Amino acid sequence: MIILNKVFHFCAAHRYGNPDLSETDNLAAFGEDLNIHGHNYELTVSITGAVNPATGFLVDLGHLKEVVKEHILKQVDHSQIEIDIPWFKGRQPSTENMVVWMWEQIAS
C-alpha cells in the first residue's frame, strides 16, 4: 500500500457571522473575520492503495485532476464561498465545512 498526495491551489473569499447573534457577540466570536477577506488555499487529495502492476500507477492522475477541477475548483476558485456556493447558505464558510463540502462533491 502507498499513499499518493496531489496538491491543488485556489483563491477564495469569505466572511464569518451569525445572523442570530448580536453585533457584539459576532465580534467576540469572529473578530476581524466578520469582514470579507480572502485566502490562497491549498487542497491536498490523498489516494491510498496498491500500485497497479500493469500500469505502474496507483491512480490516473489526469482523471483525478479532472474530477477535482470539475467538482470543486470550478465552483470555489475566485468565489465568495458563502454567497456563490449554495451549500454554504446558512453555514459558516469555515475550513471544516469546506472539507465536508469538498468530500461530498467528490464522493457523489
Role assignments for model-derived ranges:
Residues 1-108:
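Charge-rich, low-complexity N-terminal segments
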